[in-house]
């Protein structure tokens, strides 16, 4: 082709050929390449769809084919995260992106990074997976649930949950809320955290734990504001 801006001729290769070059040059250095499919966009098959649009017939497919041809590991990041997005639903997925449908927010970046780690763990015999930190399994959130009973979750700041120990220490109201409910009919769990704003509660993954424990019929009582007027990433 001729480059419009310079008038100089240049050779342009396919996506697959560029990927093969990366793989071969990595191997030539004695390093180990791993191919990923690209992250999913905030794009649904249509306006009423509950399915994220995949790239398994274009760039995702071509990356997989290169990996197979070059005998290197492949992680389908697109599929792993897209499946999560579909469980989250459209409204929550909006918080995963920043400005446009491609570039993620901090929340979305963490979801993609977690998906990448999941994919690496799933590659049989991949030494790199041994260097990943152990997966932390949340066994606390929702643990008070009894069959047929809803759970009341509280989230918020130090006025909802504090030291909550001695009569002469600071207490949050969420720590005593259970005293006002008939706990033979409902469970009450306080997942607030002192010093948190609505943003940092989300940013630290605390909301995800509650969100993942929610079932139809549950309640979430939320109170933030004391720490939301400060610096964006503190409080």
Where are the regions that the model predicts?
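Structural motif
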Residues: 197-205
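Acidic helix-start/capping segments at beta-turn-to-alpha-helix junctions
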Residues: 43, 193-198
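Alpha-helical cap/lid subdomain in secreted, periplasmic
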Residues: 1-106, 110, 114-125, 206-235
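Short, flexible loop/turn segments with low-complexity composition
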Residues: 125-139
């Amino acid at each position: 082709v001729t480059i419009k801006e310079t008038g100089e001729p240049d050779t342009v290769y396919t996506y697959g050929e560029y990927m093969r070059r990366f793989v071969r040059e990595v191997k030539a250095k004695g390093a180990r390449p791993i191919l990923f499919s690209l992250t999913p966009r905030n794009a649904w098959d249509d306006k009423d769809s509950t399915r994220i649009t995949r790239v398994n017939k274009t760039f995702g497919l071509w990356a997989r084919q290169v990996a197979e041809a070059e005998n290197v590991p492949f992680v389908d990041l697109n599929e792993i995260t897209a499946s999560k997005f579909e469980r989250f639903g459209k409204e929550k997925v909006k918080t995963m992106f920043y400005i446009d449908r491609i570039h993620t927010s901090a929340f979305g970046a963490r979801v993609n990074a977690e998906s990448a780690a999941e994919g690496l763990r799933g590659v049989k015999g991949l030494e790199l997976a041994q260097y990943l930190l152990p997966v932390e399994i949340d066994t606390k959130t929702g643990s008070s649930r009894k069959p047929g009973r809803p759970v009341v979750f509280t989230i918020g700041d130090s006025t909802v949950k504090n030291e909550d120990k001695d009569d002469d220490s600071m207490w949050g109201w969420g720590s005593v809320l259970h005293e006002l409910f008939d706990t033979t009919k409902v469970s009450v769990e306080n997942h607030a955290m002192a010093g948190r704003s609505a943003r940092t509660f989300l940013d630290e993954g605390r909301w995800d734990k509650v969100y993942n424990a929610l079932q139809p019929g549950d309640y979430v009582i939320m109170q933030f504001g004391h720490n939301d007027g400060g610096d964006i990433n503190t409080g």
